[in-house]
Amino acid sequence: MSKSTGSARVHAWLELVRWHKPSGRLILLIPAGWSLWLTPNAPPAPLLVGLIVLGGLAVSAAGCIANDLWDRRIDPLVERTRNRPLADGRVGLQEAMALLLLALAVALAVLLTLMQGLPASGRGLSLLLALAALPPVLLYPSAKRWFGYPQLVLAVCWGFAVLIPWAAATGSLAGGWPLALVWLATLLWTFGFDTVYAMADRDDDRSIGVRSSALSLGRQAPLAVAVSYGLAAAALGLAAALQGGGWIIWPLWLLAAFGMQREAALLRRPDLPRSAYGRHFGRQVQLGGLLLLALVLGQLP
């Protein structure tokens, strides 16, 4: 194998797990950060943060590979996805399966490391949550074939990015309202931004015969996104208030909440180019990161 061929192969692997587009990885890690900085034990230990980041990257990689395995016959028919490595043949089926197993092995190694510092009850809970997360993560890509709102399935997947870090930090899910609210905020935010992501593919999805919340909601999709973002910001703000964060949280929270509504309002413009939906997704990473920054600063003495 020549150096150029090897480099192209590695680049194809990175595309398969979407590491060439960091916004998609960050948008999973941000709710994990919300969770860690809202636990009673906040701020979290640096080692715990590092393990959660590594585990999140591994699970995200596994989810992306599973998505492309499910969609390898559909992706060539969709403008946005036709150049993905499995769709255009740069990565073979067996190669993708091997990478999927590797990603799951890394996620398992992270889980076992996290469990070492927990009491017996906490270890059992962490293992149960990890096992419960696996089916929706691997089956989510199939939801568009049988469910009109597959973005709800992704939201459930994202919810585990809140539950697992909380359990790893505290050894339980006895978080009361703060935990319930940050979990709900994550589900709502995820449904909103993934609905926008699906809006870019409406014409292709309609012609292929697959489903999405963008198609199911029709002209009401921008309103649904705005409501989802508004409720998500409210839930996260209430969770922060219940945990007693510092005053610095609130100006940043207001800025992020306003930004989310502004972005949702822009979706009402007629004849938006496909690129506008990608920019919206990137801005949600920024706004979600701003909310995380607010929580981090709120923990400072």
What spans do the regions from the language model cover?
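Interhelical loop and helix-boundary elements at the membrane-water interface
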Residues: S2-L26, R73-L100, V137-C157, R202-V227, ...
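Intramembrane alpha-helical segments
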Residues: L14-E15, A62, R84-L181, E263-R268
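Hydrophobic residues within membrane-embedded alpha-helical segments of Major Facilitator Superfamily
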Residues: I27, L57-V59, L99, A103-V106, ...
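Membrane-water interface of transmembrane alpha-helices
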Residues: G63-R73, F191-R202, G259-R268
